[in-house]
Amino acid sequence: MVLGLALGLSIPLCLIVGAFVGYFVSMKVFKRQMRKNPPITEAQIRSLYAQMGRKPSEAQVKQMMRAYTKETK
């Protein structure tokens, strides 16, 4: 009887703890990957400015990159 109660309580508890740990680990890995490999590159930012008919300064490009990396933190 005690073994059944222990199994009945420990299995769902382990599943819940595992779900929380998995969630936080996956979020940490995802954020680290987004910092290392942002969804947009400096060349893409320059081409966006070129499509608008503007020539961006290096400061504008760096500002846009900082905005994207700040967003992923």
Curated annotation (Swiss-Prot):
<dbReference type="Pfam" id="PF03672">
    <property type="entry name" value="UPF0154"/>
</dbReference>
<keyword id="KW-1133">Transmembrane helix</keyword>
<comment type="similarity">
    <text>Belongs to the UPF0154 family.</text>
</comment>
<keyword id="KW-0472">Membrane</keyword>
<dbReference type="GO" id="GO:0016020">
    <property type="term" value="C:membrane"/>
</dbReference>
<keyword id="KW-0812">Transmembrane</keyword>
<protein>
    <recommendedName>
        <fullName>UPF0154 protein MYCGA5700</fullName>
    </recommendedName>
</protein>
<feature type="transmembrane region" description="Helical">
    <location>
        <begin position="5"/>
        <end position="25"/>
    </location>
</feature>
<dbReference type="InterPro" id="IPR005359">
    <property type="entry name" value="UPF0154"/>
</dbReference>
